[in-house]
Amino acid sequence: MVDTEMQEQDVTFGALVETKYLEEEPLEPENDHNPSEIPQPLLLGDGQANNGHGMNGGAVGVVDHSERKTRRVQMLSPKTEGENAKKRKTWLLDSEAQGTDEAGTPVEQVAFLREVEAFYKESFLEFKPPKFYGQPLNILKLWRAVVNLGGYEVVTTNKLWRQVGESFNPPKTCTTVSYTFRNFYEKALLEYEKCLRNNGELNLPGSTLILSSSVEKEPSSHQGSGSGRARRDSAARAMQGWHAQRLVGSGEVTAPAVKDKGLISTPKHKKLKSIGLQKHKQQTSMDHVVTNEADKQLAAEVVDVGPVADWVKINVKESKDSFEIFALVPGLLRKEVRIQSDPAGKVVITGQPEQLDNPWGITPFKKIVDLSARIDPLHTSAVMSMHGRLFIRVPFEQ
């Protein structure tokens, strides 16, 4: 099957062969959104108005109807500075003192959204209501969840953003819960919180929460609070240790290549001092084997076709009878990643997310892995596990 997309990029290939996955299709992400989290529009109907029926005069009925309608409109209209301060305090008292539902009613959600919009407008700041998987995010629930934990600084210091995000029931495929909801809060509510703190309207027991919640720190295996590049580099290091044991030389199994330097530097130093020159020579030969392994790993050339996708990590290793390609494509499902191979020694990895407007900035990409020998595309296989870890075995041409 010839890939017409590759011909448009002026790349010369032979007959590209589709590579099939070896495991079953993962389950589709469930729609776990809570309907109460999505703000509903407030209908300003007059179905409950009497319209003058049953009253002692038509004028009395009209006055009663206008008063009820005026009360409804005032609930959504911008307040003066003094009234805004009282309303902001009410949001905290309702959630903390009375223990009501953090999500709030649809009326409360819309009212709080209007209040935040008015604050940003008064501060001459741009405000864009956040969306999570295409649905408006309940910022009232996000505000109450963070404030009840002690505010932005406490949640960030104690790495509680995952706990905040889990309360929104994100899909199982969402692997950046902490980063996503911290980003939502920073863009929509952080300036609002700072203003309340500076005005003395928001007093939170930060030190007490830091001590009490230290045990509930967020696991850092797949999450991080740093930049996107730092998180992806961490994921790449985890991918390198995925296949920890490999064959070296005449079938000898070595230890994993990814280790903590602090754990191996001190024992090595002691052995060199105690044993002497003979042990030093043996260590040098082992270093030579590791160097050869590194050279084999960096032998392949990876080229981007179209926009550069530096967040996709690809490593290639050469074994006795095949090439082994280890790739990390976080945020993509198996059906969104396409693999093709050419007998001339080229493997094409294409990623096409179904949802282009995603909160992680995942964009379509195409990478060509140029191997150093001819391959057998008919026996090429791929396995994709959780968190976007992709393994491709490419046998040599027989």
UniProtKB/Swiss-Prot annotation:
Domain sHSP: 305-398
Record keywords, A-Z: DNA-binding, Nucleus, Transcription, Transcription regulation
Stretches for region Disordered: 25-87, 213-236
Main location: nucleus
Disulfide bonds: none
Domain of life from the UniProt record: Eukaryota
Residue ranges constituting the ARID domain according to the UniProt record: 106-197
Family matches, as SUPFAM superfamilies: ARID-like, HSP20-like chaperones
Protein name from the UniProt record: AT-rich interactive domain-containing protein 6
Upper classification of the organism: Eukaryota, Viridiplantae, Streptophyta, Embryophyta, Tracheophyta
Gene name of the encoded protein: ARID6
